[in-house]
Structures are given as C-alpha cells and as structure tokens.
Regions:
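Glycine- and acidic-residue-enriched helix-capping/strand-helix junction motifs
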Residues: 12-27
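A broad detector of the eukaryotic-type serine/threonine protein kinase catalytic domain
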Residues: 12-13, 38, 56, 90
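Hydrophobic/aromatic beta-strand patches that form the interior of the parallel beta-sheet core
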Residues: 6-8, 41-43, 121-123
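Short beta-strand elements in bilobed, periplasmic/extracellular small-molecule ligand-binding domains
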Residues: 29, 33-43
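Caspase-like (clan CD) cysteine peptidase catalytic core
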Residues: 2, 46-73, 77-134
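A generic structural signal for short coil/turn motifs at secondary-structure boundaries
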Residues: 14-18, 41-42, 94-96
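Active-site histidine-acidic residue metal-binding/catalytic motifs
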Residues: 2-15
C-alpha cells in the first residue's frame, strides 16, 4: 500500500448539537478507501486530545506513502479568518476558549506542506459558522 487515509467522523458533541451523518459518512468513506487500497486510520467522536494525536500520528506516517487523504465530517467554524474543526469536547463559553479547544486546520496544512512532490488530499465536510460574529 502506498496510500494512507485519516478519516474522522464527529457526531456526538458534548456542548453543541449532535449530527446524524458524520459517523455514517466517515464509515462509508473508510470502507471505500480501504477497498481502493488505502491504509485507513478511522476514528469516530474524537475529543481535542485524541484528534490532535490522530493528526500527528498520520503526519508522522505520511512520509512512507505517496498519497495521503484526510477526511473530516462534523462541525466546523471560522473565527477571525481561522478555520477550525470541532472536537466532541469543544468549549464554547467564549471566543478564546473555543479557539484553544478546537482543532486549527492550519496545523494540518502546515504539516502536509513538508511533503512536497506527494499527493495530499483534504476533504472537509463541515460548516464554517462563526458563533461569535457580530451582525
């Protein structure tokens, strides 16, 4: 196998609404990619610590593969122009706590930028709401 995929589906959130489809979507994508010859790291309902560990482990393994694919389904948000993926334990009391307790997608993008000449695919099935925007 020369293709690696990280699949995360977050549906069961502690402080925001539960989502019906992310678990199903992640399960389907993981199954299809496995059939296509990807080595699949597949996770459901990750808190921030487990999400950061999963992404770090994926990036550390990526050097051994010619193709990497990252798929996330769940809540997302954009605050101050920064895109975040929402872990199941995200803190929403104020903007600063939210930004610290969500996964900054730039961490992933910076990580894959070191793998030049490889194919890296990122699929995000998430909204980009800003719960702190002023209308």
């Amino acid at each position: 196998m020369d293709r690696l995929a990280l699949i995360i589906g977050n549906s069961k959130y502690q402080r925001v609404g539960t989502l019906k489809n992310p678990q199903n979507d992640a399960t389907d994508i993981a199954s299809i990619l496995s059939t296509l010859g990807f080595e699949v790291d597949y996770y459901l309902d990750l808190n921030i610590s487990k999400m950061e560990t999963a992404v770090r482990d994926y990036l550390l393994k990526l050097d051994e593969f010619s193709t990497g694919l990252f798929f996330f389904a769940g809540h997302g948000m954009q605050i101050d122009g920064i895109n975040f993926l929402v872990p199941t334990d995200c803190e929403l009391k104020d903007k600063a706590k939210t930004m610290l307790s969500c996964f900054n997608i730039n961490k992933y993008l910076e990580g894959i930028s070191h793998y030049k000449g490889k194919t890296n695919i990122c699929i995000l099935d998430a909204c980009r709401d800003n719960p702190y925007s002023v209308s």
